[in-house]
Amino acid sequence: MNVTLITTDGRKRKVSINTFDEARQFVCNYQYNSPAEIIVLMDGSFILIDEEGKLKNLDLNRIATDIAHENNCIYPSDYIVGDVLLVDDVDEFDSLPFE
């Protein structure tokens, strides 16, 4: 399935994933084996982030933060760090195998 990768330097590009594990590779560093977190947006799509990104001092992702604020998904003082995936097709994502 195709999803949108939003990087901390402001770039957006389509990437293909075939498993949840592949999706996690884009946002979480396996060196730390971090869990991924889902932030559900008002239209039903969601952003996949590194749950421990702030602990790792990852860079601010201004675009993802703006999207989350516009959808009232995070507190006004909160922010998102690290590269994220924007997933539009929740049903297709849910059907992905884990590995």
Region annotations inferred by a language model:
Residues 1-21, 25-26, 30, 34-99:
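Detector for the mature cores of small, proteolytically processed
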